């Protein structure tokens, strides 16, 4: 399966908005995706929404976070090595060496952890932008 094409998503694989992406899933998954989206917006209200790699993306000082729904979980990208080393709560979830954390659909979304991840990404992106200038 190519990157960004979610396992649960119907045949449409070219989304132009996050709303289109979310609406392509069953109601239970839509609810979780709306909750994730709102949590990201609460932490990074100035981030712009986009679709990149056919995934919902938030952009602030560069790409901030992406998310995708799959058959058994929702993935959030990227999780940096620094986060994996310092955020104890990540140990409760499947992570990959490619900067992904998976939140199983049979458990509530860990909103405090998601807030922390997004806040870390905002700080990282801001610092990277300041280094570049």
Model-predicted segments: where are they?
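Charge-dense, helix-prone N-terminal extensions
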Residues: 1-133
């Amino acid at each position: 399966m190519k990157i960004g094409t979610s396992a649960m998503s119907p045949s449409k694989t070219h989304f132009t908005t996050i709303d289109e992406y979310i609406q392509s899933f069953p109601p239970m998954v839509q609810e979780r995706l709306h909750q994730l989206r709102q949590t990201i917006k609460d932490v990074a209200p100035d981030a712009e929404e986009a679709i990149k790699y056919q995934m919902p993306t938030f952009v602030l000082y560069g790409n901030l976070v992406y998310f995708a729904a799959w058959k058994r979980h929702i993935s959030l990208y990227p999780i940096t090595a620094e986060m994996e080393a310092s955020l104890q709560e990540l140990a409760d979830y499947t992570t990959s060496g490619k900067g992904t954390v998976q939140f199983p659909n049979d458990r509530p979304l860990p909103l405090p952890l998601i807030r922390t991840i997004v806040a870390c990404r905002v700080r990282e992106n801001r610092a990277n932008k300041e280094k570049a200038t």
